[in-house]
């Protein structure tokens, strides 16, 4: 930074020939120097270009304005980095920086040539880029034309001309490609170049397929990216995330290939099995028909087709596959389904099928086809693929994209910090120039009394050096004048203005939390708490949550944009408390660098007297938007002269805009202020003006530049929008204000909103006229109410104030629209205006925090997503145009291939709109069906390429980036810190008032009753009197909410009396977080102890709020209820503390009844010391022991499992299986008795109190009740009653009892229960959000989905045949096959609308709804094809907002909840520093390993050679390559290959079998019996044996078992082994590691999901077993048996195909179904469904499984992925330790865990980095000071520990963790102690170590002596003798010091590198002493 020229106007210098000469001179100097300094450069990084002065950025504002003559002129480069590079810059009017190369462009135009200068001027002009932008947009519009008229050709030439002109200008200005900053050096220009070249090519050269080349023109749309500034960065981020995705992509492709191979082997040719007619004519055979048939069409008559399906019915040859109907048999013939594109016949198609499975697009169809053709057992294949492939891989992509985004974000934050620093440095430079002035100011201040006054300490800039302001002094004077006038006029207006600007006293009180009523008192209190702090540091103690935020002049520039978004929807009057340092309107934007405490005004150290001590400026914004900087509150002087601030927590915000007099008076009343006469003191005035004013002016200028409107607008507003005409009016206004602002009015309005919403939701089709009228009147009434509210508010607040509040603007808009709609009600086609009424629903957000938060999150994300949305729009546009250009013609020409009527289908690419819809559909994840059409009409390759690109770029990358952004705006702060507005508080105040009123009425009633019915007891008077004062206080507290107390000053004034409460209040008010948490839950009254884990007031000190005894009692109660007695395995729920003290006698039961019961009914008290009581107590103790026994629990679990299993047998075939039915009936009774017995035992053992306070016990109790009731009913013979039957279905809940018994599931359930409140919240918000769309749908489509159909083939009559309902009914009378039919899922009322929307949001069944909507004409009119085409837009908007945002909110909420619960459970991680974590993790890995005994090398020479070969790494890799080759040959296989090919593949396979057998044999020879000690070897052996057997018995095995080729596929798993050897595969290893880490959690979630599926399957069987077979329900997929139900439910788990299963259940009456239909073998009649049950069943299942469980799965993966990436970035990974031990095995073949010292050097050199210590390494190793044992041996852990320490570096953290580590090792590796050969005593060890040290010392000493002797220098003997003992003493001292057990080694870390002994000894010795003690004990015992 030091190199930067001083910023300001004079830093701009024209670029002249001298400048160029100077640069050349510098370059030559550098070159001369360069030869000398070449070496230096390698080590040090050179200077970097300044990030603020990059080309394309705005000029930093510190440089001020550009002097007039310098705009668009070449200037010398400002960036010192380019001082020796040939560059210059040009600045345009907008201060954008353009950097050019100073070498001649095109070798002839120097920077000074007029042509180049003109080109530069044109290039940098803003109009130039505008022109290009407009051209591109116009061009895009022309590109969307599907059949352009002829004249467009000329337009095309114009475009090309403009682009050519643009490129020419750029080339002339910049040069072509030689040197930096030339035309082709910018990749975006390549795009232009390519576009222009292609434009000329297509024009002048005839290249055949022009349309393909024309599509290149689409790339012009990409140019928008290069023109709009923000887009480049987003595209950068996208490209970054695509790079990051490479690993995931490789892994995905690999996994899909493996699965595709398995699919190929399992299902090859299966999808061609079709049902073929048996009754053929005589000369026809299957072969002859197949050979003669020209096309599929001819074969159609031989195959069996289901109604409405395009493909023939599939069937299979196995028993559990699909069967053919009568008269048909199963054959393999014809083509595959879906135009032949769905199959597993070749590797390619199988891969496509699996990619489709992974993206879950229409996969239910593939699933059903495959299961029908191959058999139901293959469901397992799909389960694995969906869970591993789909959920895991897709979410990994999400995780990676999210991480890339997160990193990008972090980088941006870092950059911002960096800039802040740079600006600070610039400021410091400015300040240095002012120091003299400062000194004068300080001197002048000394004679002014401090207590009375202080001047603004703002001295950022002085008049001499203010480069920040380049405006004239005259302007400044004018502004000052205006300001004075304004202030004085403000004072004249006086009282009039009071009300107008800020409302009543009360509202002001609400707005400014002013706790400093007794300033001195508070100050003294604070002083006591912080006696040693300097005056300036006090602020830190007061505002502990917020470190002092530096007010940087520049901060508004960087963060200005974000400010709006945060409070966009918050009520502006009451923006967030934390930002009370003024918001929006003010210049000083609080920026909080977390760790930095610096005083606000940087000259603090120099002039303390002039400072506002609390380091805070009060900047109020007056009505003009001008910031008046008012000083902070005055300092209070304490007797010792220390300054203390008074605490003002106030807020200046944009809407109570202004330094209104009242506000100022309010402040003056409580704090000393700059008095008027002081300002008149000439000296002071001058000083204040000269210093502060200049800056203030600059500040004002900046402020003005940020004002939303020009100054004249403010003048106008003041004149016309503030109504203060007469005193009567003002009184009236006050009265109105009092009414309108009352909380009750708010409550009333909220109730009106809810009612209005209800009225709107009551619309339906068909409605009676009376009902219509009621709704119409209701609408009028509500419109009236809302209009009245608006008018009254306008009167009360004045338009100026009214329109400053976001909500008011919103209200006024809606009211206006409602009124407009009333007048235009009869105008046809304006019914859409009605939907604007729906927006009223959003007014609820005011008082509903979560809705507010959701809107805010959407608002913020849309803001943040602005650029991304643009990019997405550009991508969609480009692909839509590409599709149209490439495939449009083909759709038209080949339409007959895909549509029998040769009409264009709904999804085509013939025009832009339809093309856009297809691309949008692909983005929604639905690509496969439209792609089949495309491939059929336009050829496979192009379609595949385009679709895959849209899928990967659009869906996987961009949409995941969307999601990542959503998740990031979902940080827990958003969820917990929802800023609430006063209105929210108003509601709560109103509710609190009502509660108080009710309490008051209750109280008076109670007192009245007591008075009238009871005589006063003696002494009551006295007690009452003494209790009274407290009582009053307590009532006050308990009946009011904290929020109110905080607002009630009178209460606070009594603070001395209730110090306990108010001190806690003070605390909470001092801390921002606490304040926030207050607001969240204002309904909590103070005296209630808050249960942990549920409170929002986490940060508040609950102990202070509740009395101690109270909290102790509650703790005790909690502990008792939390641990469940219903199962012995149960632990307390997460978040609850463990009991502090165990009950005294753990094996005794607790009391039966609660204390309350015993008090009321004394008979419940039993004396247990005598008589019957004692017997009873013994019985209870016995029961208690039985129940607590572990076997009892196991038995109950077994019973639960058996009884649940029994339910699975009760399917529709139970009537036919009499024996099973009888067994089940008895079993049912037995289970019921057992469970009743269990319940009774528990009642006796635990007592009712314990039993019924446990949730799990309640569950058991209810389920037992159900069984009991059904049992009794059966006995009495009422089993066929309806209610009893439905009760029986509740038995399906039995498996729920298993929940509390299985640890893993309970963990998940607890996590879920924790998340339920927030999930419900989001669900509610979603419902509100959807309600709007639903009501809108009802308005648009109610009653329009009816159509007249021909019932024989289900086709719709055309409009020419039937135009409307009446015609249809007329036709019905003629023919019986006609029906006027409604779509089952429609918008006839809001409920059905919700169902439709759910189908659209899950993309299942949405096509039918959309088609019906698009075809709809009018109520009772016959639909017309695509009549209402633009209704598609309704669905597009809903999908974006309803589906995209709201459904992903679920993921957000769940992930967020996981994190919060982790915090609550608080593992050790939270308390560890980063450094500690590193060590901890390394040690964790270290501790888990120990050296293995390697397989010994055989003695035999021959075997030895083979052993060397087999154990070589190269051998492993060779085998891996062979495995991969084997896979490739398997991929080549395909269905129906030629005999020759089969023959070749057979022999290739034989070769591979021989090779693998060879490997097996070689290993067996060399490894002998050790071969079977390795798991992989056993696996290989099995595969080889199976392959050999398979070769000979292939036919037989395939018949009875699975095809043996499958095992070869499993071999692929061995590839996992080479990943470790490939250094580049680190990313993939991380991903697999993440999977391994998440497996346990995923298993638990899987279990829970299975349980849910099980219960739903039982329910489904009992409710839907007999529904009509249509849509998704058929002979294979139904609810008839348990297995079938599970198959159906598995597919709905991903929400696939639930619409098909629901459709038949919605049939409720004829003619849809037949209620009298007889089912043979069963007593059930009819095949109608129960719509309400069906809808509830499927919707609840989807919410539970799809939204909750599956999202938990996602949460776990995201979590583990981030953990795994952290692990992979750590310096030492698992692999490094593995590698250490692998090398170790070679040096320690017997696994003694020791190594000789002499081998150590070789060993260290043999390791891989990072542990490697290359030779020469002796010195380093000796320096490590490794402890040795006898025989000069060193233990492996000692070495590993030392090496690890070397990698991680020395640090203090090591010491803090040292003892833990040692214990860990000892427990993980007990062998360490047992292998220690020195087992005698501690002393022995010390001597041993000492001996080695002495030897070393002695050798050294001898060596020195020899040297001395040789050099023949004479030394006296005595000297030498004296020398030795000293040395010895020192050595011994050293040793003792190191190893004495008493001495702690706390100091070790402070002395530079601690010796290893000092790190590890004490613990080791501990273990040794333990060991010796143990041995002594053993000896003693043996003696005995």
Swiss-Prot record:
Cytoplasmic side: 1-125, 173-185, 228-241, 403-744, 796-804, 848-864, 967-1185, 1249-1250, 1303-1315, 1456-1512, 1566-1574, 1626-1638, 1758-1984
Catalytic activity: Na(+)(in) = Na(+)(out)
Keywords assigned by UniProt, alphabetized: Cell membrane, Cell projection, Coiled coil, Disulfide bond, Ion channel, Ion transport, Membrane, Phosphoprotein, Repeat, Sodium, Sodium channel, Sodium transport, Transmembrane, Transmembrane helix, Transport, Ubl conjugation, Voltage-gated channel
III repeat copies, ranges: 1178-1486
GO MF term (any one): sodium channel activity
Compositional bias annotation for Basic and acidic residues: 26-39, 489-509, 574-584, 1019-1035, 1960-1984
Annotated spans, Disordered: 26-55, 458-540, 574-609, 1015-1039, 1089-1145, 1933-1984
Compositional bias per record (Polar residues), positions renumbered to this chain: 1946-1958
Major place of residence: membrane
Intramembrane segments: 347-363, 915-927, 1393-1403, 1685-1697
All ranges on the Extracellular side of the membrane: 146-150, 205-210, 268-346, 364-376, 762-770, 822-830, 888-914, 928-939, 1211-1222, 1277-1285, 1341-1392, 1404-1429, 1533-1543, 1597-1605, 1662-1684, 1698-1731
Compositionally biased spans, kind Low complexity: 458-471
Residues covered by the IQ domain: 1887-1916
Composition skew (Basic residues), residue ranges: 474-486
Chain positions of I repeats: 112-410
Membrane-topology descriptor: Multi-pass membrane protein
Family named by the database record: Belongs to the sodium channel (TC 1.A.1.10) family. Nav1.7/SCN9A subfamily.
Domain notes: The sequence contains 4 internal repeats, each with 5 hydrophobic segments (S1, S2, S3, S5, S6) and one positively charged segment (S4). Segments S4 are probably the voltage-sensors and are characterized by a series of positively charged amino acids at every third position.
Protein name as catalogued: Sodium channel protein type 9 subunit alpha
Organism in which the protein naturally occurs: Mus musculus
Lineage: Eukaryota, Metazoa, Chordata, Craniata, Vertebrata
Protein's gene: Scn9a
């Amino acid at each position: 930074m030091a190199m930067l020229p001083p910023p300001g106007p004079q830093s701009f210098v024209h670029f002249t020939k001298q400048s160029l000469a100077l640069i050349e001179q510098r370059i030559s100097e550098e070159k001369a120097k360069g030869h000398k300094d070449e070496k230096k450069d390698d080590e040090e990084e050179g200077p970097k270009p300044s990030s603020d002065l990059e080309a394309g950025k705005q000029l930093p504002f510190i440089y001020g304005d550009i002097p007039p003559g310098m705009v668009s002129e070449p200037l010398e480069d400002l960036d010192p980095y380019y001082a020796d590079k040939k560059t210059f810059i040009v600045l345009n009017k907008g201060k954008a920086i353009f950097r050019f190369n100073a070498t001649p462009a095109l070798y002839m135009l120097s920077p000074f040539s007029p042509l180049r200068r003109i080109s530069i001027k044109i290039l940098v002009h803003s109009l130039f880029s505008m022109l290009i932008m407009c051209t591109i947009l116009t061009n895009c519009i022309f590109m969307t034309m599907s059949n352009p008229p002829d004249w467009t050709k000329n337009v095309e030439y114009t475009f090309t001309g403009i682009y050519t002109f643009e490129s020419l200008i750029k080339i002339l200005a910049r040069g072509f490609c030689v040197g930096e900053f030339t035309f082709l050096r910018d990749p975006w220009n390549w795009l232009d170049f390519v576009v222009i070249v292609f434009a000329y090519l297509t024009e002048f050269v005839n290249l055949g397929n022009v349309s393909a080349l024309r599509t290149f023109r689409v790339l012009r749309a990409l140019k928008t990216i290069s023109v709009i500034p923000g887009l480049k960065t987003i595209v950068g981020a996208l490209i970054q995330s695509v790079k990051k995705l490479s690993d995931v992509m490789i892994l995905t492709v690999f996994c899909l290939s493996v699965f595709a191979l398995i699919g190929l082997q399992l299902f090859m040719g299966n999808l061609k099995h079709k049902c073929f007619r048996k009754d053929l004519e005589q000369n026809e055979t299957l072969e002859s028909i197949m050979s003669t048939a020209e096309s599929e069409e001819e074969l159609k008559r031989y195959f069996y087709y289901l109604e409405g399906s395009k493909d023939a019915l599939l069937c299979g040859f196995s028993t559990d596959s699909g069967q053919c109907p009568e008269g048909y048999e199963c054959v393999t013939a014809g083509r595959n389904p879906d135009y032949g594109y769905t199959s597993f016949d070749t590797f390619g198609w199988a891969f496509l099928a699996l990619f489709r499975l992974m993206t879950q697009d229409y996969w239910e169809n593939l699933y059903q086809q495959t299961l029908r053709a191959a058999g139901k057992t293959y469901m397992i294949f799909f389960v694995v693929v969906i869970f591993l492939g789909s959920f895991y891989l897709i979410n990994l992509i999400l995780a990676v994209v999210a991480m890339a985004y997160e990193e990008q974000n972090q980088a941006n934050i870092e950059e911002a910090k960096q800039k802040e620093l740079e600006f600070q440095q610039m400021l410091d430079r400015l300040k240095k120039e002012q120091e003299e002035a400062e000194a004068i100011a300080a001197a002048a201040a000394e004679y002014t009394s401090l207590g009375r006054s202080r001047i603004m300490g703002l001295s950022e800039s002085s008049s001499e050096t203010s480069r920040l302001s380049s405006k004239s002094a005259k302007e400044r004077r004018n502004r000052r004048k205006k300001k004075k006038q304004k202030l004085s006029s403000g004072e004249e207006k006086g009282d009039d203005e009071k009300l107008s600007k800020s409302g009543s006293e009360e509202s002001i009180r609400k707005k400014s939390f002013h706790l400093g009523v007794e300033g001195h008192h508070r100050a003294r209190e604070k002083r006591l708490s912080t006696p040693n702090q300097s005056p300036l540091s006090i602020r830190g103690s007061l505002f502990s949550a917020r470190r002092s935020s530096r007010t940087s002049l520049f901060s508004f520039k960087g963060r200005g944009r974000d400010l709006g978004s945060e409070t966009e929807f918050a009520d502006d009057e009451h923006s967030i408390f934390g930002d009370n340092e003024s918001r929006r309107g003010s210049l000083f934007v609080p920026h909080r660098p977390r760790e930095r405490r610096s005083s606000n005004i940087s000259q603090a150290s120099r002039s303390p007297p002039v400072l506002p001590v609390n380091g805070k400026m009060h900047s109020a914004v007056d009505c003009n938007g001008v910031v008046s900087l008012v000083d902070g509150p005055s300092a209070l002087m304490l007797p010792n002269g220390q300054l203390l601030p008074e605490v003002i927590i106030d807020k200046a915000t944009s809407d109570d805009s202004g330094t209104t007099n009242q506000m100022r008076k309010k402040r003056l009343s409580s704090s000393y202020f700059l008095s008027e006469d002081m300002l008149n003191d000439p000296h002071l005035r001058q000083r204040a003006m000269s210093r502060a004013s200049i800056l203030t002016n600059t500040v004002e200028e900046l402020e003005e530049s940020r004002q939303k409107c020009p100054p004249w607008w403010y003048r106008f507003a003041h004149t016309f929008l503030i109504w203060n005409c007469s005193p009567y009016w003002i009184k009236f206004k006050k009265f109105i204000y009092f009414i309108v602002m009352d909380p009750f009015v708010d409550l009333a309005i909220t109730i009106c909103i809810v009612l209005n919403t209800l009225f709107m939701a009551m619309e339906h089709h068909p409605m009676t006229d009376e009902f219509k009228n009621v709704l119409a009147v209701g609408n009028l009434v509500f419109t009236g109410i809302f209009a009245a509210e608006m008018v009254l508010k306008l009167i009360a607040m004045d338009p100026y104030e009214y329109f400053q509040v976001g909500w008011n603007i919103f209200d006024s808009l809606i009211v206006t629209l409602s009124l407009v709609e009333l007048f235009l009600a009869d105008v046809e086609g304006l019914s859409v205006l009605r939907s604007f009424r729906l927006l009223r629903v959003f007014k609820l957000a005011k008082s509903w925090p979560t809705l507010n938060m959701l809107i805010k999150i959407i608002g913020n994300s849309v803001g943040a997503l602005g650029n991304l949305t643009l990019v997405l729009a550009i991508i969609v546009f480009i692909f839509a145009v590409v599709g149209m250009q490439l495939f449009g013609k083909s759709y038209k020409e080949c339409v007959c291939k895909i549509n029998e009527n040769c009409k264009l289908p709904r999804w085509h690419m013939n025009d832009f709109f339809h093309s856009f819809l297809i691309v949008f559909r692909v983005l929604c994840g639905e690509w496969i069906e439209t792609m089949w059409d495309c491939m059929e009409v336009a050829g496979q390759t192009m379609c595949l390429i385009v679709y895959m690109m849209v899928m990967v770029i659009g869906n996987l990358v961009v949409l995941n980036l969307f999601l990542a952004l959503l998740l990031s705006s979902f940080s827990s702060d958003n969820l917990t810190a929802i800023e609430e507005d006063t209105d929210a508080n108003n509601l709560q105040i109103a509710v609190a008032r009502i509660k108080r009123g009710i309490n008051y009425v209750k109280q008076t009633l109670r007192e009245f009753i007591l008075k009238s019915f009871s005589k006063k007891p003696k002494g009551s008077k006295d007690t009452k009197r003494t209790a009274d004062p407290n009582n009053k206080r307590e009532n006050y507290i308990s009946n009011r909410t904290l929020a109110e107390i905080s607002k009630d000053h009178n209460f606070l004034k009594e603070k001395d009396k209730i110090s306990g409460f108010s001190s806690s209040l003070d605390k909470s008010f001092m801390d921002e977080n606490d304040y926030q948490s207050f607001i969240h839950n204002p309904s909590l009254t103070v005296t209630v102890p808050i249960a942990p884990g549920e409170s929002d007031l986490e940060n508040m000190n609950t102990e202070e709020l509740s009395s101690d005894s109270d909290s102790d009692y509650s703790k005790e109660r909690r502990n008792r209820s939390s641990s469940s007695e219903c199962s012995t395995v149960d632990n307390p729920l997460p978040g609850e503390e463990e009991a502090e003290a165990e009950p005294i006698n753990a094996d005794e039961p607790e009391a039966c009844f609660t204390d309350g019961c015993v008090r009321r009914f004394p008979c419940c008290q039993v004396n247990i010391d005598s008589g019957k009581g004692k017997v009873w107590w013994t019985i209870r103790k016995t029961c208690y022991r039985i129940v607590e026994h572990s076997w009892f629990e196991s038995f109950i679990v077994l019973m639960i499992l058996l009884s649940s299993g029994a339910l699975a047998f009760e399917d529709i075939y139970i009537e036919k299986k009499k024996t099973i039915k009888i067994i089940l009936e008895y079993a049912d009774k037995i289970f019921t008795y057992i469970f009743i017995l269990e319940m009774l035992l528990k009642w006796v053992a635990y007592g009712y109190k314990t039993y019924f306070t446990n949730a799990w016990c309640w569950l058991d109790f209810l389920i037992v009740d159900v069984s009991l009731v059904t049992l009794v009913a059966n006995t009495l013979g009422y089993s066929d009653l309806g209610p009893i039957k439905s009760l029986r279905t509740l038995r399906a809940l039995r498996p729920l009892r298993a929940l509390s018994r299985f640890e893993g599931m309970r963990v998940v359930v607890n996590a879920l229960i924790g998340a339920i409140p927030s999930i419900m919240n989001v669900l509610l918000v979603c419902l509100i959000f959807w309600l709007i769309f639903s009501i809108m749908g009802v308005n648009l489509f109610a009653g329009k989905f009816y159509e007249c159909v021909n019932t024989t083939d289900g086709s719709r009559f055309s409009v020419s045949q039937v135009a409307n309902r009446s015609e249809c009914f007329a036709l019905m009378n003629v023919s019986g096959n006609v029906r006027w039919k409604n779509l089952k899922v429609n918008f006839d009322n809001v409920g059905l609308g919700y169902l439709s929307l759910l189908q659209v949001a899950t993309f299942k069944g949405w096509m039918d709804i959309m088609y019906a909507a698009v075809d709809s004409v009018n109520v009772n009119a016959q639909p017309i094809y695509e009549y209402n085409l633009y209704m598609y837009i309704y669905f597009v908007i809903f999908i974006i907002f309803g589906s995209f945002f709201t459904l992903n909110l679920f993921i957000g909420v769940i992930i967020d909840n996981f994190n919060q619960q982790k915090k609550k459970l608080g593992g050790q991680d939270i308390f560890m520093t980063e450094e500690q974590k590193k060590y901890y993790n390394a040690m964790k890995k270290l501790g888990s390993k120990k050296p293995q005994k390697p397989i010994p090398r055989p003695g035999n020479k021959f075997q030895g050679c083979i052993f060397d070969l087999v154990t070589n790494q190269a051998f492993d890799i060779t085998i891996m390559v062979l495995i991969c080759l084997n896979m490739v040959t398997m991929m080549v296989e395909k269905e129906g290959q030629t005999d020759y090919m089969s023959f070749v593949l057979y022999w290739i396979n034989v070769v591979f079998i021989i090779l693998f057998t060879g490997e097996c044999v070689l290993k067996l020879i060399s490894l002998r019996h050790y071969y079977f000690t390795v798991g992989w070897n056993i696996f290989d052996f099995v595969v080889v044996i199976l392959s050999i057997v398979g070769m000979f018995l292939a036919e037989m095995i395939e018949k009875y078992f699975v095809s043996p080729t499958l095992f070869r596929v499993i071999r692929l798993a061995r590839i996992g082994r080479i990943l470790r050897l490939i250094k580049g595969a680190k990313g993939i290893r991380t991903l697999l590691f993440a999977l391994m880490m998440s497996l346990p959690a995923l298993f638990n979630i899987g279990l829970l999901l299975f349980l849910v599926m099980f219960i739903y399957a039982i329910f489904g069987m009992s409710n839907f077993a007999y529904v009509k077979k249509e849509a998704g329900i058929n002979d294979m997929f139904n609810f008839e048996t348990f297995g079938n139900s599970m198959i159906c439910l598995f597919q709905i788990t991903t929400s696939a195909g639930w619409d098909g299963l629901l459709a038949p259940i919605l049939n409720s009456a004829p003619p849809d179904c037949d209620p009298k239909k007889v089912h043979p073998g069963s007593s059930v009649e009819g095949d109608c469904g129960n719509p309400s049950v069906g809808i509830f069943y499927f919707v609840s299942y989807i919410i539970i499984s799809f939204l909750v469980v599956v999202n938990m799965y996602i949460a776990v993966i995201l979590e583990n992925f981030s953990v795994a990436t952290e692990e992979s970035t750590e310096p030492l990974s698992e692999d490094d330790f593995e590698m250490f031990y692998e090398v170790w095995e070679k040096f320690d073949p017997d696994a003694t865990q020791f190594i000789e010292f002499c081998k150590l050097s070789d060993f260290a050199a043999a390791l891989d980095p990072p542990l490697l210590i290359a030779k020469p390494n002796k010195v380093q190793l000796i320096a490590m000071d490794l402890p040795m044992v006898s025989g000069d041996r060193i233990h492996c852990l000692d070495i590993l520990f030392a090496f690890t320490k070397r990698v991680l570096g020395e640090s203090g953290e090591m010491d803090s963790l040292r003892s833990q580590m040692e214990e860990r090792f000892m427990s993980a590796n007990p062998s360490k102690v047992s292998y220690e050969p020195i087992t005698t005593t501690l002393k022995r060890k010390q001597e041993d170590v000492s001996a080695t040290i002495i030897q070393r010392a002695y050798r050294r000493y001898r060596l020195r002596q020899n040297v001395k002797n040789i050099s023949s220098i004479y030394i006296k003997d005595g000297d030498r003798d004296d020398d030795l003992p000293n040395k010895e003493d020192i050595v011994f001292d050293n040793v003792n010091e190191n190893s004495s057990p008493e001495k702690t080694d706390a100091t070790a870390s402070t002395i530079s590198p601690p010796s290893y002994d000092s790190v590890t000894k004490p613990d080791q010795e501990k273990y040794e002493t333990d060991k010796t003690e143990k041995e002594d004990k053993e000896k003693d015992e043996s003696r005995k």
